[in-house]
Amino acid sequence: VFMRDFEYAKDKVLMGKERRSLILSDEEKRITAYHEGGHALVAKLLPGTDPVHKVTIIPRGRALGVTMQLPEGDRHGYSKAFLQNNLMVLLAGRVAEEIIFDTITTGAGNDIERATGMARKMVCEWGMSDVVGPMTIGEQGEEVFIGRDWGHARNYSEDTARIVDAEIKKLVETARENCHKLLQENINLLHALAKALLDRETITGDDIDLLVKGEPLPPFDADGSAAKQEPAAPAPASADAEGETFKLEAEPSQDGGTGEKTQDETKQQ
């Protein structure tokens, strides 16, 4: 059992099983590369966000590509700034598509759903809207006989509902505008990340660090992972040994790829 086997199992649990049988066109691969590159770049550039662990454009589960962020430790609470930055990360894939292709696709459907849900909780549950204030809007009612999720207590007026909708939209639109500005200012890095994804299909957080610094990526194996060499082994103790050393080459992955997910997934709608 090698470390790559643990990595493969972890990726399968966190991101879903690879679907290499799903053949994407060159244009779909390019769109997915920029989409996932947008997520990864914004997550890398914004302070306080969870580090990017791995990015892949290999289809996994229902996703055409995945950007996986993993927290460095346990997190039991979230600041408003952290949530605002995460809204930007969620919307970065769609914004990257707009910038590069001057169009949008259905691939951002799950991202938009998650961003809207987060913004709604910020306004309605966590009191993070200056206009609405520290109030809970729309309490969940008791269970009703035809379904647990059917009953909702209507404890707010139509005017309040309009204000809530406006505040949710404001949070999402502000995040989108800030994300657009950040990606435009770092467009060369976005191109570099997309190219690396198209070349390798999967890149790691360490690869992203190198790309942001403008440094070349290390050679990679057939599975797309960086090729690493073990330190030289000592020469065998024999009479005819002439200082020979042996290096253990990294073995190729059995699965043919090591993809991973902000689960910011690019979802096929």
List each model region and its residues.
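C-terminal helical "lid" subdomain and adjoining coupling/linker elements of P-loop NTPases
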Residues: 1-6, 12-31, 125-134
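Active-site micro-motifs of SAM-dependent methyltransferase domains
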Residues: 8, 39
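Soluble catalytic regions of large protease machineries
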Residues: 29-34, 40-269
